């Protein structure tokens, strides 16, 4: 397993609702947040990488939509997830 696979399985294990859950909004948001954080570090070094920046903006938009869905469906889970990931100041 690569480092990315190990990190991904740790994130899934931490945020899954039940054993084997990989598709819940909580897991998807956590995985997107990890990828967004990695790309943010990438842009500190490669400021002119606009091709990847477009992908980053797409990921941020997708995370926002998932968070909106979760907020409407399960506000308690939304608040817990935001707190755990440290997304809101």
UniProtKB/Swiss-Prot annotation:
GO cellular component: cytosolic small ribosomal subunit
Single GO MF descriptor: rRNA binding
Family, similarity comment: Belongs to the universal ribosomal protein uS15 family.
Listed name of the protein: Small ribosomal subunit protein uS15
Keywords, comma-separated and alphabetical: Ribonucleoprotein, Ribosomal protein, RNA-binding, rRNA-binding
Subunit structure: Part of the 30S ribosomal subunit. Forms a bridge to the 50S subunit in the 70S ribosome, contacting the 23S rRNA.
Function recorded in the entry: One of the primary rRNA binding proteins, it binds directly to 16S rRNA where it helps nucleate assembly of the platform of the 30S subunit by binding and bridging several RNA helices of the 16S rRNA.
GO BP, sorted A to Z: translation
Annotated organism of origin: Bordetella pertussis (strain Tohama I / ATCC BAA-589 / NCTC 13251)
């Amino acid at each position: 397993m690569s480092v990315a696979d190990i990190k991904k399985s740790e994130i899934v294990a931490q945020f899954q609702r039940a054993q084997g859950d990989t598709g819940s909004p909580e897991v998807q948001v956590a995985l997107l947040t990890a990828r967004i954080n990695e790309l943010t570090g990438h842009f500190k070094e490669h400021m002119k990488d606009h091709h990847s920046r477009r992908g980053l903006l797409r990921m941020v938009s997708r995370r926002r939509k998932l968070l909106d869905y979760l907020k409407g469906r399960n506000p308690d889970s939304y608040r817990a997830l935001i707190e755990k990931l440290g997304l809101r100041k």
